[in-house]
UniProtKB/Swiss-Prot annotation:
It comes from Aspergillus fumigatus (strain CBS 144.89 / FGSC A1163 / CEA10). This is Mitogen-activated protein kinase mpkC. Its EC number is 2.7.11.24. Its main location: nucleus. Gene3D superfamilies: Phosphorylase Kinase, domain 1, Transferase(Phosphotransferase) domain 1. GO terms for molecular function: ATP binding; MAP kinase activity; protein serine kinase activity. Activated by threonine and tyrosine phosphorylation. The keyword ATP-binding applies. PROSITE patterns: MAPK, PROTEIN_KINASE_ATP, PROTEIN_KINASE_DOM, PROTEIN_KINASE_ST.
Amino acid sequence: MAEFVRAEVLGTKFEYTTRYVNPQPIGMGSFGLVCSAFDQITQQPVALKKIMKPFDSSSLAKRTYREIRLLKYLRHENLICMRDIFISPLEDIYIATELLGTDLGRLLSIKPLDSKFSQYFIYQILRGLKYIHSANVIHRDLKPTNILINENCDLKICDFGLARLQEPQMTGYVATRYYRAPEIMLTWQRYGVQVDVWSAGCILAEMLRGKPLFPGKDHVHQFHLITNILGNPPDAVIEKITSKNTVNFVKSLPSREPRDLSTVVPKDTDFDAIDLLKKMLVIDPDTRISAQDALRHPYLAPYHDPTDEPVASGPFDWSFDSADFPKETSKIMIYSEVLDYLNVDNPADPAPFDPSTPFDPSALEREFSEFLSDSGQT
């Protein structure tokens, strides 16, 4: 049986196995605390995420179970990789993942990114999304703080707690407001993987601009900001809205023509970057570009390699997600997943992403290392 050490971090009890030493707080969210620590077995730094009181409610237990299942199934260079999982004596769950130095949100809050980094990062985001979507998974909460980056320019998408199957009925409140797709705000009962592409488009715009494109103060203000730039929703979109009140709201909006997106980014922005942005930020999701097609866009030609943009081995099994389990049943299911992970030889971490297309990754890494140093992130 594993031995545990108990410490107090930011006023929170933090219990971890003796495999790990020197926990240091790096983040706190509504569902738990994240600390950096050193793994004495692998001799590598890790991020230890504490999920607090996962068995207190059926909804939290299901969210926890879903995240564990997804982390076990999704294996890709541009997705965060689970290294270990354990349940503490106080019945909190701890998930160890690889540790990356910073996140995109933190970087963007300090200084604008050089265009070459924006290009490389959106490529990796879309590469990860292509894989996620091929598994019939929608991330639903893509935002800069869920994009982790290290000093080698390696990028990984994290936080799959809100991820869902693409299905006929979907809940409306997902994604941080600035990055929320219009079909979610328009209370559609069905939406798909295109919501992640919209979020990625918002992230690309923010990298190019150095500030959010749609910084809405509330739900209504958010939609006004979108229509101020992209124009009124087309009839094809309005016809899919199921709420009469929402239809009335959309029809009451003043008539607005779409603006040229070149007016919302710096004057020296690459034409191809603007063109990709136009294809990602389309109000009608049925005509919005897919992650797979976006990878083929000329803007990403320096990195695009169809032989090294893998898809999942098959769709993720979502059969559990439609059922409502009692808390005790969910608890047994979570314990079973943890034991399964610990008792099965887990595949090695995906190799670091290294495009075979003709560019010099070492030069980009050196420049990014200097950028991080100048930003105080190293």
